[in-house]
């Protein structure tokens, strides 16, 4: 039986060391979000900084750049090892791509080699699925497993920001779908055509791994990070 979600976000992460992969992207926002829970946030740029962390966040940004930099800084293999060993990891946007076992449309380098991922999530993702930067959008989503809203009015939808976000095209049998964008949602012109009448998966969990297509760190939405804290503590 899991413990109920806490409403005291400022203490939820007390005593935990949360690493944030700080090679590229919006890692500063994730560090602030982790520290807002009372955790110690640690920017990860070299393998030695992985020692002693309780969980890791892979931020949004450019998945191809993070992939190349992780290999250049000799972080890719240590990260794969930690993920395989059960380290709790949360990936947002590019982080979702990097946690996926498969990319439907991988980028390639000049030699034609496809981008690599750290893997761990039995999912197939499509990069930039909702369109380009100018087609970014915001929407309210129902999200399974979150704590109560700050207003105390019950579990409120997540206000999600999508910035060149991926979506999940396939989930394996051990993957739980936490949120999806529905065709019946408000018809933002920026993503209505992309949906083509099909619900698109934008948040998933499999055991110790959590991923979202969107960016809770840029909206002040605390509950996704709080869910990750509860996962680290074994409470969710």
From Swiss-Prot:
The keyword Lyase applies. Coiled coil: none annotated. The keyword Hydrolase applies. It comes from the Bacteria. InterPro entries: Class_I_gatase-like, PdxT/SNO, PdxT/SNO_CS. Keywords: Glutamine amidotransferase, Hydrolase, Lyase, Pyridoxal phosphate. PROSITE patterns: PDXT_SNO_1, PDXT_SNO_2. GO terms for cellular component: cytosol; glutaminase complex. L-glutamine binds at residues 61-63, 127, 163-164. Pathway: Cofactor biosynthesis; pyridoxal 5'-phosphate biosynthesis. Its EC number is 4.3.3.6, 3.5.1.2. The active site is at residues 93, 215, 217. It catalyses: aldehydo-D-ribose 5-phosphate + D-glyceraldehyde 3-phosphate + L-glutamine = pyridoxal 5'-phosphate + L-glutamate + phosphate + 3 H2O + H(+); L-glutamine + H2O = L-glutamate + NH4(+). Catalyzes the hydrolysis of glutamine to glutamate and ammonia as part of the biosynthesis of pyridoxal 5'-phosphate. The resulting ammonia molecule is channeled to the active site of PdxS. NCBIfam families: PLP_synth_Pdx2. In the presence of PdxS, forms a dodecamer of heterodimers. Only shows activity in the heterodimer. Belongs to the glutaminase PdxT/SNO family. HAMAP family: PdxT. PANTHER family: PYRIDOXAL 5'-PHOSPHATE SYNTHASE SUBUNIT SNO, PYRIDOXAL 5'-PHOSPHATE SYNTHASE SUBUNIT SNO1-RELATED. This is Pyridoxal 5'-phosphate synthase subunit PdxT. It comes from Arthrobacter sp. (strain FB24). The lineage of its organism: Bacteria, Bacillati, Actinomycetota, Actinomycetes, Micrococcales.
């Amino acid at each position: 039986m899991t413990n109920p979600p806490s409403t005291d976000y400022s203490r939820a992460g007390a005593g935990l060391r949360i690493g944030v992969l700080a090679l590229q992207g919006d890692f500063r926002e994730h560090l602030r979000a982790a520290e807002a829970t009372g955790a110690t946030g640690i920017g990860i740029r070299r393998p030695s900084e992985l020692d002693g962390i309780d969980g890791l966040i892979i931020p949004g940004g450019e998945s191809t750049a993070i992939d190349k930099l992780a290999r250049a800084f000799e972080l890719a293999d240590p990260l794969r090892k930690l993920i395989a060993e059960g380290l709790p990891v949360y990936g947002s946007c590019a982080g979702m791509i990097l946690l996926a076992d498969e990319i439907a449309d991988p980028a390639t380098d000049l030699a034609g080699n496809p981008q690599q991922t750290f893997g761990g999530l039995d999912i197939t993702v499509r990069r930039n699925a909702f369109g380009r930067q100018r087609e970014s959008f915001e929407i309210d989503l129902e999200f399974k497993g979150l704590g109560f809203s700050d207003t105390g009015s019950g579990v409120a939808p997540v206000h999600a920001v999508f910035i060149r976000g991926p979506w999940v095209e396939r989930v394996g049998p051990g993957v739980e779908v936490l949120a999806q964008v529905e065709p019946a949602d408000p018809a933002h012109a920026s993503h209505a055509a992309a949906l083509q009448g099909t619900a698109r998966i934008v948040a998933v969990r499999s055991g110790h791994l959590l991923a979202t297509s969107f960016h809770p760190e840029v909206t002040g939405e605390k509950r996704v990070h709080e869910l990750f804290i509860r996962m680290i503590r074994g409470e969710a």
